[in-house]
């Protein structure tokens, strides 16, 4: 029984997901439906958390919009997510960057990873 579930989940997983880590700046393009129109909307920010659970994997992206912090959780293999592109690699030493919520301005900067 579980082999059938694993096979179905494997078929539904996206193959074109780039590798990224917490601290990386990513741009996620998401399909948004407004009335009868369907368009792509970009959301660019820093990955502060990743949850790896196969088909149910998710990641949290944080950005500052008009001086207000905005966080959004995306399901990695969701059909709503069109594409994910890594803009900048960040060097951090923790898996969850929740401490960035309290920091603003230059204190919230992340060093760039060189490799």
From Swiss-Prot:
Classification of source organism: Bacteria, Pseudomonadati, Pseudomonadota, Gammaproteobacteria, Enterobacterales
Keyword Transmembrane helix appears in the UniProt entry: no
Inducing or repressing factors: Part of the rpsP-rimM-trmD-rplS operon.
A GO cellular-component term linked to this record: cytosol
Subunit structure: Part of the 50S ribosomal subunit. Contacts L14. Forms two bridges to the 30S subunit in the 70S ribosome, contacting the 16S rRNA. In pre-50S ribosomal subunits interacts with RsfS, which may inhibit association with the 30S subunit.
Keyword flag Transcription regulation: no
PANTHER family membership: LARGE RIBOSOMAL SUBUNIT PROTEIN BL19M, RIBOSOMAL PROTEIN L19
InterPro entries: Ribosomal_bL19, Ribosomal_bL19_CS, Ribosomal_bL19_sf, Translation_prot_SH3-like_sf
Role played: This protein is located at the 30S-50S ribosomal subunit interface and may play a role in the structure and function of the aminoacyl-tRNA binding site.
Protein name, entry field: Large ribosomal subunit protein bL19
Sequence similarity: Belongs to the bacterial ribosomal protein bL19 family.
GO biological process: cytoplasmic translation; ribosomal large subunit assembly
Organism: Escherichia coli (strain K12)
Pfam families in the cross-refs: Ribosomal_L19
Sorted UniProt keywords: Ribonucleoprotein, Ribosomal protein, RNA-binding, rRNA-binding
GO MF term list: large ribosomal subunit rRNA binding; structural constituent of ribosome
